[in-house]
């Protein structure tokens, strides 16, 4: 009897030790845009450490999925169980509500700055010494200048490039649509290669040596400049530019099914913390935290930013007017071929 009791006590002790030593594990999948790999590779480890500290040692692992954000959103609608999305265009988050009811209609009001913890604008990457003397948008329509940026039909990055060029021309031309269309026709005609995504455009410009100017997010052109330091690329930020917001959201239906709602919300809220905001600026993204930005005035040139919604209307209107089949983009491309 004493032996059996001893065995029971021993088993109970072993079980309690196993339970005490058991560390819960949580996993998040972040579905993000094509050129954000390095940014989130830097952001994820400090949050994983903070989560473990705040949650009794719970081991959190954040996995990443990267591609064009429109393609990423489609994958979620088709069943990818991403917990959070960090995209470069509002429409690619909105479609998760419109087509899948995976998030609520008011998703943009759940986090500060329209659920955009950081933003960027467009930058020009030019070759060493700026041999074509590129300083602003009007320099990009000269006949001796060849441009590289992705196809606006497949790239959110390129849609911002197109809209930024249109907005700058509209301002310069005093709202004369005919003159703006002439500018845009030549601007698009000067594109030497239309890659499908941002990384493909980088390869075309930096490794294949095509084009005089690569147009991409300010964050991306600065990181390319650092990556290909030996080539001596230079960055030019035009005077009139576009506000490119980077919206984020937790995917309600998925986090509820995955049991990850608490971690997903904490992760996206943490992106607004001073620690995260500082890391974000290390990768040349701009943030709305004045204390962080005041220390970096030399890093981010002043530029006059306009919002897509103020210049063009809502994103659904923009997509319908400019980027659907037969829209303004197709008409301008056709005009450039004539």
UniProtKB/Swiss-Prot annotation:
Q: Which domain of life is it from?
A: Bacteria
List the gene name: cysP
Q: Which family does it belong to?
A: Belongs to the prokaryotic sulfate-binding protein family.
Q: A single GO CC term, please?
A: ATP-binding cassette (ABC) transporter complex, transmembrane substrate-binding subunit-containing
Kindly provide the name given to this protein in its UniProt entry: Thiosulfate-binding protein
Identify the species of origin. Escherichia coli (strain K12)
Subunit field text: The complex is composed of two ATP-binding proteins (CysA), two transmembrane proteins (CysT and CysW) and a solute-binding protein (CysP).
What is the stated purpose of this protein?
Part of the ABC transporter complex CysAWTP (TC 3.A.1.6.1) involved in sulfate/thiosulfate import. This protein specifically binds thiosulfate and is involved in its transmembrane transport.
- Enumerate the InterPro entries for this protein: Sulphate/thiosulphate-bd_CS, Sulphate/thiosulphate_BS, Thiosulph/SO4-bd
Which stretch is the leader sequence?
1-25
Q: Which PROSITE patterns match?
A: PROK_SULFATE_BIND_1 (PS00401), PROK_SULFATE_BIND_2 (PS00757)
Subcellular location per UniProt equals:
Periplasm
């Amino acid at each position: 009897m004493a032996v059996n009791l001893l065995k029971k006590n021993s088993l109970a002790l072993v079980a309690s030790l196993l339970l005490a030593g058991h560390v819960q594990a949580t996993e998040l999948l972040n579905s993000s845009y094509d050129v954000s790999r390095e940014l989130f590779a830097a952001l994820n480890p400090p949050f994983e450490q903070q989560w473990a500290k705040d949650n009794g040692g719970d081991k959190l692992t954040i996995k990443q999925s990267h591609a064009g954000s429109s393609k990423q959103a489609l994958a979620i609608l088709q069943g990818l169980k991403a917990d959070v999305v960090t995209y470069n265009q509002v429409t690619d988050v909105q479609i998760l509500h419109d087509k899948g009811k995976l998030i609520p209609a008011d998703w943009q009001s759940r986090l500060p700055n329209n659920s955009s913890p950081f933003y960027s604008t467009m930058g020009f990457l030019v070759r060493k010494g700026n041999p074509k003397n590129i300083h602003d948008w009007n320099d990009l329509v000269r006949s001796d200048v060849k441009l590289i940026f992705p196809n606006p039909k497949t790239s959110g990055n390129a849609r911002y490039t197109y809209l930024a060029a249109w907005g700058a021309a509209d301002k310069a031309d005093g709202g004369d649509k005919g003159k703006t269309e002439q500018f845009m026709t030549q601007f698009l005609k000067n594109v030497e290669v239309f890659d499908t995504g941002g990384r493909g455009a980088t390869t075309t410009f930096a490794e294949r040596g095509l084009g005089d100017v690569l147009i991409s997010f300010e964050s991306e052109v600065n990181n390319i400049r650092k990556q290909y330091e030996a080539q001596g690329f230079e960055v030019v930020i035009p005077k009139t530019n576009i506000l490119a917001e980077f919206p984020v959201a937790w995917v309600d239906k998925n986090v509820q099914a995955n049991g990850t709602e608490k971690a997903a919300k904490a992760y996206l809220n943490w992106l607004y913390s001073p620690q995260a905001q500082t890391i974000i600026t290390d990768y040349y993204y701009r943030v709305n935290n004045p204390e962080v930005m005041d220390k970096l005035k030399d890093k981010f040139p002043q530029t006059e930013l306009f919002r897509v919604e103020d210049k063009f209307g809502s994103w659904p209107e923009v997509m319908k007017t400019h980027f659907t089949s037969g829209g303004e983009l197709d008409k301008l491309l056709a005009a450039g071929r004539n």
